[in-house]
Amino acid sequence: MPRFSVIESLCRQDGICASVCPAHVIKGPKGKTPFMRPDRQDSCIACGQCMAFCPFGAARVDVLDPSDMLPLERSKLPDAESLSMLFQSRRSIRHFKKEPVARELLQHILDETRHAPSAKNRRAVRWIMVYEPEKMRAVGDCAVEGLKLGLQNPETGPVLAEAKALIKAWGRGLDPLFRGAPHLALAVAPIGQPLAREDAVIALTYLELAALPYKVGACWAGYITGIARQYEPMQRLLCLGPDAEVRGGQLLGPIGLRPTASAPRVPFATQR
């Protein structure tokens, strides 16, 4: 289990680490050196909250590397106007350039999602990156076979016409599944993990935003996600294993067409 400690020469005994610990693992009133509560030895979730909030770098959690910490430069944070522009400019990209994204860049973008929050800091989401054209084609072919099988299900009625159109378009050499995106990122999490789907959606949203500065566009891969949850051949192709499930996905690739304005939005209804 993770263990909390302090570097006493740096500690100012201000009680901040104890006050911000969400698991109430730390005891340390002002004027005294904080320590890990004996009755909470197995409760640390290694969230790093104590390390992030300590102004003097005194807090430590043994499973977390302090060299991985980034000093926060407030001047580099977006102001309200810039942040609003980012939110309003975000659009799903469905027109991609044909060239691939460098593997190193995709890995860097994926690495940014480490900072996405997760329930109780479980960090159960992992990634499957489909990179090569041959593998993308195999995933697409498998998805179409899954759609064909789904047409035999009497409960498929509401999506029958859509599935038929997808199958027909794929057979004609069109790409309704990937929309020309050269890559696919799938967020995978354990079956039965509480709030794992929500964790995956948050991580996928971080992924989309992290890609934008590099002119890498993203589009939610709803068809592939739905098929991967139900179609065993797809699960085998992705090497999922019996205890894991695809919780969401993003198509990724160099942006072909980008928006020039925000789209109008009807305000949310708010209950007061």
Regions found by a protein language model. Give the residues of each.
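Acidic, surface-exposed loops and disordered segments
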Residues: 1-272
